[in-house]
Amino acid sequence: MQRAKEVMKVSDGSLLGEPGRTPLSKKEGVKWQRPRLTRQALMRCCLVKWILSSAAPQGSYSSDSELELSAVRHQPEGLDQLQAQTKFTKKELQSLYRGFKNECPTGLVDEDTFKLIYSQFFPQGDATTYAHFLFNAFDADGNGAIRFEDFVVGLSILLRGTVHEKLKWAFNLYDINKDGYITKEEMLAIMKSIYDMMGRHTYPILREDAPLEHVERFFQKMDRNQDGVVTIDEFLETCQKDENIMSSMQLFENVI
């Protein structure tokens, strides 16, 4: 419950902010700067917490503020290549891999594991549907399993990628059937799944019609040719022109 409250203090539960609303820093006359993800922020990521809790040696104390773990013996093949592909350090990759292998000895994560992770971090709500959508976004080839390489590449984009990279990833998440377009039904399904995951014990209390209102506002702004769908170009252009959406990219860490 506490985690949901922390999330809701800075977000309405969406992966993108409210379109057209001026950020607080802008109102105060302060120039907005894209937030830099700190190690502390990285440690708030559910998937990272899950991995590192398993990476820590048995009986040892693991601090939330410390990502690098000592005595890492596991190492994935092509570590240097992964370091080049991501924005994680070598020690971070080693730590993530150790936990990954401890939790998933086969080297693959399945959808049930994702659902278990999110049910643990969001016990006050129903995280099943959101975990399903998130898993499919990580499962690039659609084979029902996620390799470590795909896992950390996705995490790198979400946690340390550029705004453009995060927006492309968000589009892929919303594009549930992967046809290259986002429909109102698809965006509404994602929004509802996030609100369901947050549960009814959040602050401020969420209205049941909030997801639909959110989607209607976004489509009014994004669907420029009024054809009922949003393309990747419409999505990127609209989001990057909206300062509130840009600043809200940091909120990915709250539901990943």
From Swiss-Prot:
It comes from the Eukaryota. GO terms for biological process: apoptotic process; negative regulation of transcription by RNA polymerase II; protein localization to plasma membrane; regulation of potassium ion transmembrane transport; regulation of signal transduction. Keywords: Apoptosis, Calcium, Cell membrane, Cytoplasm, Endoplasmic reticulum, Golgi apparatus, Ion channel, Ion transport, Isopeptide bond, Lipoprotein, Membrane, Metal-binding, Nucleus, Palmitate, Phosphoprotein, Potassium, Potassium channel, Potassium transport, Repeat, Repressor, Transcription, Transcription regulation, Transport, Ubl conjugation, Voltage-gated channel. Residues 1-30 are annotated as: Disordered. Residues 243-256 are annotated as: Interaction with KCND2. Residues 67-123, 126-161, 162-197, 210-245 form the EF-hand domain. It is found in: Cytoplasm; Cell membrane; Endoplasmic reticulum; Golgi apparatus. A lipid is attached at C45, C46 (S-palmitoyl cysteine). Ca(2+) 2 binds at D223, N225, D227, E234. Pfam families: EF-hand_7, EF-hand_8. SUPFAM superfamilies: EF-hand. One of its GO terms (molecular function) is RNA polymerase II cis-regulatory region sequence-specific DNA binding. Palmitoylated. Palmitoylation enhances association with the plasma membrane. Proteolytically cleaved by caspase-3. The modification Phosphoserine is found at S14, S60, S63. CDD domains: EFh. The keyword Oxidoreductase does not apply. Ca(2+) 1 binds at D175, N177, D179, Y181, E186. There is a cross-link at K26, K90 (Glycyl lysine isopeptide (Lys-Gly) (interchain with G-Cter in SUMO1)). GO terms for cellular component: cytosol; endoplasmic reticulum; Golgi apparatus; nucleus; voltage-gated potassium channel complex. It is a lipid-anchor. The keyword Repeat applies. Binds to DNA as a homomultimer. Dimerization is induced by binding to calcium. Interacts with the C-terminus of PSEN1 and PSEN2 and with PSEN2 CTF subunit. Associates with KCN1. Component of heteromultimeric potassium channels. Identified in potassium channel complexes containing KCND1, KCND2, KCND3, KCNIP1, KCNIP2, KCNIP3, KCNIP4, DPP6 and DPP10. Interacts with KCND2 and KCND3. Regulatory subunit of Kv4/D (Shal)-type voltage-gated rapidly inactivating A-type potassium channels, such as KCND2/Kv4.2 and KCND3/Kv4.3. Modulates channel expression at the cell membrane, gating characteristics, inactivation kinetics and rate of recovery from inactivation in a calcium-dependent and isoform-specific manner. Belongs to the recoverin family. This is Calsenilin.
